[in-house]
Amino acid sequence: MTQQLQSLIDQAWEDRANLSPKSAPADVREAVANVIGQLDRGALRVAEKQDGEWIVNQWIKKAVLLSFRLEDNAPMAAGGFTQFYDKVPSKFANYTAEDFAAGGFRVVPPAVARRGSFIAKNAVLMPSYVNIGAYVDEGTMVDTWATVGSCAQIGKNVHLSGGVGIGGVLEPLQANPVIIEDNCFIGARSEVVEGVIVEENSVISMGVYLGQSTKIYDRETGEVSYGRIPAGSVVVAGNLPSKDGSHSLYCAVIVKKVDAKTRAKVGLNELLRGD
C-alpha cells in the first residue's frame, strides 16, 4: 500500500503545475488525503532515524506540498469569537473530549496545530503554532509563542522555550526538515532553520540562530562546521573575527559537551554559565 501511495504521489508531483482544486483526479486527492491522515495519526513521518542516520521521506513531503494545490480556501470557525480563511483545517476542529483524553496531550488556548501534524502523549502546547507535517514527540513542551514549522521533527522530552522558531520546508522551500533530537533544550527566541539537525541531549542558549550558513565553532577543538550540532553540546551565541581583523561575524559557539548523566544532574543555568 505504501509503495502504491509513494508512486502515485511521485507521479502527481511531476504534474503538479497542472493540478488545481477543480482539475485534480480523484485518485490523487485520495492519496494525498491518506498521507495527511497518516501524518496526523503519527503513522507516517517526513523523516525517520534508521541505523543512526536521519532519512527524509521526500515523497511524504511532496504530499504535504501537493495538499495546498488541492484545496480552496474556506472559512474556519475559531471558538465563536472569530473566523479564519485557509486551506488547512485545525487538527482539533472535530475533537471531542474523548479524543483529547485518548491523545493524552495538553493544548492551552489559543494554541494552533494544523491537521497533518502529530502531537504525542504528554506533550504540552502552550499558546504556540505547529504546522502541517510536523512531529512533536512524547513529553515535549512547546512554550508560549514558539513555532514548529512544517515537517519539522521534534524528539522526546524536548523543551522549546518562549518564542523559539523551528523552521519549516514550505516557505521558502527547503530540501530537508529541521530535526531536534531527544532531550534537547532550545532557549528563548532562538531560531533553528534550513534543515539543521540538533542532536540529542544538547542545550541551545537563548538567542542562538542556526541555519545552514551559520558557522558552528567548537571552542575545544577550534573546528568550524555547518548544519549540525553534535550530541551533548552546550551552545551559545558568539562571533568570529575576520581574517584581517577589521570586523567579526555572528557564529554559534559550542562551549562544552556533556553526557546524558551530566545533562540530567546539572541545572541548565550551571551548564551555560560554567567555564
Curated annotation (Swiss-Prot):
CDD domains: LbH_THP_succinylT
InterPro entries: DapD_Trfase_Hexpep_rpt_fam (IPR005664), Hexapep (IPR001451), Hexapep_transf_CS (IPR018357), THP_succinylTrfase_dom1 (IPR023180), THP_succinylTrfase_N_sf (IPR037133), Trimer_LpxA-like_sf (IPR011004)
Predominant cellular place of this UniProt entry's protein: cytoplasm
EC number: 2.3.1.117
Pathway annotation: Amino-acid biosynthesis; L-lysine biosynthesis via DAP pathway; LL-2,6-diaminopimelate from (S)-tetrahydrodipicolinate (succinylase route): step 1/3
Any one GO BP annotation for this protein: lysine biosynthetic process via diaminopimelate
Localization, UniProt: Cytoplasm
Catalyses which reaction(s): (S)-2,3,4,5-tetrahydrodipicolinate + succinyl-CoA + H2O = (S)-2-succinylamino-6-oxoheptanedioate + CoA
GO molecular function term, any single one: nucleotidyltransferase activity
Alphabetically ordered keywords of this record: Acyltransferase, Amino-acid biosynthesis, Cytoplasm, Diaminopimelate biosynthesis, Lysine biosynthesis, Repeat, Transferase
Keyword Heme attributed: no
Any one of the GO CC terms: cytoplasm
Record carries keyword Acyltransferase: yes
Annotated signal peptide: none
Family, similarity comment: Belongs to the transferase hexapeptide repeat family.
Protein name, UniProt field: 2,3,4,5-tetrahydropyridine-2,6-dicarboxylate N-succinyltransferase
Taxonomic path: Bacteria, Pseudomonadati, Pseudomonadota, Betaproteobacteria, Burkholderiales
Gene: dapD
